[in-house]
Amino acid sequence: MSLIVEDVIRPNANFPSEIWGDQFLAYDQDEQEGVEQVIKDLKEEVKSELLTALNSPTQHTELLKFIDAIERLGIAYYFEEEINQVFQHMYTAYGDKWTGGNTSLWFRLMRQHGFFVSSDIFSTYKDKEGRFKESLEKDVHGLLELYEAAYMFVPGEGILDDALVFTRTCLDEIAKNPSLSNSAVSSQIREALTQPLHKRLPRLEALRYIPFYQQQASHSETLLKLAKLGFNQLQSLHKKELSIISKWWKSFDVANNLPYARNRPVECYFWALAVYFEPQYSESRVFLSRFFSIQTFLDDTYDAYGTYEELEQFTEAIQRWSITCLDGLPESMKLIFQMLVKIFEEIEEILSKDGKQHHVNYIKETLKEAVQSYMTEARWAKEEYIPTIEEHTKVSYISIGYKLALVAGFACMGDVIADDSFEWVFTNPPLVNACCLLCRTMDDLGSHKGEQDRKHVASTIECYMKQFDASEQQAYESLNKKVEDAWKEINREFMITCKDVNIHVAMRVLNFSRSVDVLYKNKDHFTHVGVEVINHIKSLFVDAIIT
């Protein structure tokens, strides 16, 4: 039964309907008999191979290839301790002076694991005139490795900027070769140019890489079998969680009670999984996907439903955390508030088992900050005010909701998380700021056209055009450059500045950035769920990998 019975004329965003129905409501336990022991035995084999190769310097190049395969197959979480030991040993043994083969792979993996090795090692790739050597232009494998390595750049690394331009140009030319149009090489190049490894979601990369790895003559049968069994085992857990989310969603009859809002329970779970895919973060996924849903309702209520006066009252209710402030508001707003209260009560009960119930207060404070930013944007929209870039940035970094989502997800990370992680986020550190800049900018670039078809707060695009008297095209070019610069900042902070931050915490910030490259690249794939995201969801939650 719908709660919406009113005559108030409201804005209508006309969001596309939810497309999954009850598809994920039921969960059938997959047959797992005997699989646990097989996985355990395979893991021991791999651990033995890792440590044997580590103790033999002549095998270190092959060891890097082995670890790269482990990570791309999506099973690195089985071997965190061993992999960390490998890279710590390699950094101690070689520092910046790698003497093995495949320099690009060594460089990429060292930086991925937080070791800021020098990019000067690529100076040997250039000739006396400072150009990349012609001999590199036809080496497809070498070009791909250098291309992927270049995405580990930080601000001011001209040699990596040059390497990226050089490899993009060469790979693009090779991909156009008619004789390669249907080859695996051409497909590999196109995938890399579309989305480099550093920006890919680990779970989606595993799906892509498993069949590719199987085709390689040099593949390890042990790794391949473990990757397939591990993928299916983890998929079973993910499907169980998605069923929990679907039942929670259905219990609120969201489609009828909040018809103006985006109904995206499955997409919210996909997003949470993008950030926390590993098995140990089950509680984070379930909580964050529900919280994402409520964040979406809040965003749409401020953006595409409430009157200005209603939103002022609703904001006060959340700031005071008082249900008595809701008198006279639409039933939909009361429902959202009730959902917030209920989810906070549930998470507080869960956290109290470990004496961490006070972590709920961090989420509440960040929520209040976000809601205040929504209210500021509602005022700007009402007044048709176009702020300066500086004004817009100060508010929109908060309203984009990623700081809130980070804090919410942290709460359920178990022993990994402590008060200092929340306090770190509350200082607005450069890593989090760079992530918010990336997310805000890509969101605006992806959703700008659709949002400006209706009355909407000015996006970064309009602010830039007004402040710099620029064309829309100039604004797009400038903001795309900001996105690339934000990735450089994220890399720098991850490798250099955040050495004292728990690596598992910092990795969530990186994964959030990656998720946006999937959901907001070129368009708003979260609001307008297209074939690409539908296929991602089906492959992750419907289709099993044949073992």
Curated annotation (Swiss-Prot):
Its cofactor is Mg(2+); Mn(2+). Optimum pH is 8.5-9.0. Mg(2+) 1 binds at D299, D303. The gene is ECS1. It comes from Artemisia annua. It catalyses: (2E,6E)-farnesyl diphosphate + H2O = epi-cedrol + diphosphate. Keywords: Lyase, Magnesium, Manganese, Metal-binding. GO terms for molecular function: epi-cedrol synthase activity; magnesium ion binding; terpene synthase activity. CDD domains: Terpene_cyclase_plant_C1. Mg(2+) 2 binds at D299, D303. GO terms for biological process: diterpenoid biosynthetic process. A motif (DDXXD motif) lies at residues 299-303. Pfam families: Terpene_synth (PF01397), Terpene_synth_C (PF03936). Binds 3 Mg(2+) or Mn(2+) ions per subunit. Its EC number is 4.2.3.39. Belongs to the terpene synthase family. InterPro entries: Isoprenoid_synthase_dom_sf, Terpene_cyclase-like_1_C, Terpene_cyclase_plant_C1, Terpene_synth_N, Terpene_synth_N_sf, Terpene_synthase-like, Terpene_synthase_metal-bd, Terpenoid_cyclase/PrenylTrfase. Inhibited by high concentration of manganese. The Asp-Asp-Xaa-Xaa-Asp/Glu (DDXXD/E) motif is important for the catalytic activity, presumably through binding to Mg(2+). Pathway: Secondary metabolite biosynthesis; terpenoid biosynthesis. Sesquiterpene cyclase catalyzing the production of 8-epi-cedrol. Able to convert geranyl diphosphate to monoterpens. Can use farnesyl diphosphate or geranyl diphosphate as substrates, but not geranylgeranyl diphosphate. Probably not involved in artemisinin biosynthesis. Constitutively expressed in leaves and flowers. This is Epi-cedrol synthase. Coiled coil: none annotated. It is an enzyme of class 4 (lyase). Mg(2+) 3 binds at D443, S447, E451.
